[in-house]
Amino acid sequence: MTPRRAVLDCGSQRAAVMPTLLTVFCLLLLAPGGGNRGLVWHVEDAGGRVIRSRHGDRSLNPASLVKLATSLWALERLGPEYRFGTRFLGAGDDLIVRGGGDPDFQPENAFLVAAALNRAGIHRITGRLLVDDLFWIGWEQGKGVPGQDPEGHAGQMAARLRRAFDPDLWDGSTREAWMMLAQRQGLDGSNPPRVVIAGGTGRAWPDSEKRVRAEARPIPATRVLVVHRSRPLPGTLKRFNAWSNNDINRLEATLGSASDLQTFLAERWQIEVNDSLRLVSSSGLGKNRLTPRLAVRLLRDLRDTLRRWDLDLSDVLPVAGCDEGTLKSFPALGRGGRRGSMVGKTGSLTTTDGGITLLAGTVATESGSRLFCVAAPQSGSGLAAARAKEERWLLDLMAALGGARGARCGTPMPQAGDGVELEEPAPPAPPGS
């Protein structure tokens, strides 16, 4: 019989009441060296008092923690009730899509629009499907920078929308997406909506752009067929943050550039742009700079901003043990009595600046709430091991503060197509009516 090896779990509920000597041992693990070699961190209580800090002012690449700044920026500029509007217009034989910058329009959203078009009696477009520069469907992993290659962008997005509109063009994943949406929203899964595009696809010129069409014919008058309005902004931000989706950079088309985001934070905090704060992207890709202390300040600012609207961090960030996404790389944080105690954001880069993995958020303990940022710089060759070390650090912190205070999971993270609104203008009355 193989003897069992004793394991000291400083993050367990039992650790919260262990004898004094063992408690001291767990606290030593939080000190420089110990089991945390290579980590840097900064921790504050709910009121902003520094609890502990190790290289908290070290300039680091924050990776996807930049998405916290982008979320704050979007909320301040647009407000929590904001919905992105996408208009579907009839223009002669063509269907024109005027995007409103919705960064999270998916095939599921296209299914709902197709159903609305069907209700209006539209099942076939004899002309073309044209989309403008502010329309996206599906994901690009942050590669689609707004404003770059508008012709290529329009061609790709129009082709995706055409496929989503026509079940005969669906692949297996698109069909599965329809069945899941139908199940969630009580639709007839055996009768999917269908809008066939008989003509080609391409770019719809922006309304403000002066351009002569290649065809020597007048541009026909347009009429609104359907207006699709996204779910309110917080739900969209939560989806991007939970999956650490770099397509959050699509918000630049609505808000401004990464340089504008940097200026927003610098002016808001009244600090200079230097190696403590330097942003080159709104997604976290590239060589951005932030300190652990400023990452915690960013979390606090986001938390306080959300509270103005009776919201909290869990409305825009995932909850360990409750939500899908990248927090599952830290599985112990959502188990047992810890479930619901931690709300946060992950960040990782494999090669840039030697690689880094970070975890920042708020954790509820028996001693109160704590805001934290922990990072493992130069960990590109061993991200999994670095995440395990960060997880152990946070478990030990919880234990030192009396243990985690778990909570029931709240409203589930919205799925694609959930929470949207459709405006379907009444068809024009026949002449003489």
Roles of regions detected by a PLM:
Residues 146-150, 160-316:
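A small/polar active-site loop signature that marks catalytic segments
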Residues 51-53, 255-433:
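Small-residue-rich helix-loop
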Residues 62-80, 129, 240, 372:
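Active-site SXXK
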Residues 76-92, 309-314:
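Short, well-structured active-site flanking segments
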Residues 73-82, 99-101, 108, 117-124, ...:
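Sec/Tat-exported extracytoplasmic proteins
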Residues 103-177:
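Polar, glycine-rich mid-to-C-terminal structural blocks
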Residues 29-54:
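A short, well-structured edge-of-sheet supersecondary motif
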Residues 85-103, 128-140, 213-218, 223, ...:
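Acidic helix-start/capping segments at beta-turn-to-alpha-helix junctions
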